[in-house]
Amino acid sequence: MGLLLLLVGIGGGFGAMARFALTQATASISKQIPLGILLCNIIGSLIIGMMAAFLIETKLFNEDVSAYVRFLLVTGFLGGFTTFSSFSLDILNLLQRGEIFIAIGYIMVSVLASLIAVILGFYIVMGVYK
């Protein structure tokens, strides 16, 4: 339990730093749409789909190593990189500014693009192993 907790913490720290870097890098691109969080969630969904397929298909790892990889990268890094709470706060901020249609569009694009990304990531990796 202690090692898994450490792996989640390390992965989460790096994921949060990567999210911060991406949101800072994209802040000047759009003042209305929270592009950084949108990209984090879409990229994270793509990667989690790829990781799911990789861990299912590859025989490189035994079950114990797969658990360590999953806790470090999926639960830790991607948990720190993607964020539902920031997404929700961004929506609240848009609504408070009266930008209802932008908020609705942001919700739709975020959910649909993230879902498409996780499916795409999964099947890209599954295709490699078939």
From Swiss-Prot:
PANTHER family: FLUORIDE EXPORT PROTEIN 1-RELATED (PTHR28259:SF1). GO terms for cellular component: plasma membrane. GO terms for molecular function: fluoride channel activity; metal ion binding. The chain crosses the membrane at residues 2-22, 36-56, 71-91, 100-120. Na(+) binds at residues 79, 82. It is found in: Cell inner membrane. Na(+) is not transported, but it plays an essential structural role and its presence is essential for fluoride channel function. Keywords: Cell inner membrane, Cell membrane, Ion channel, Ion transport, Membrane, Metal-binding, Sodium, Transmembrane, Transmembrane helix, Transport. It comes from the Bacteria. Its main location: membrane. The keyword Cytoplasm does not apply. This is Fluoride-specific ion channel FluC. Belongs to the fluoride channel Fluc/FEX (TC 1.A.43) family.
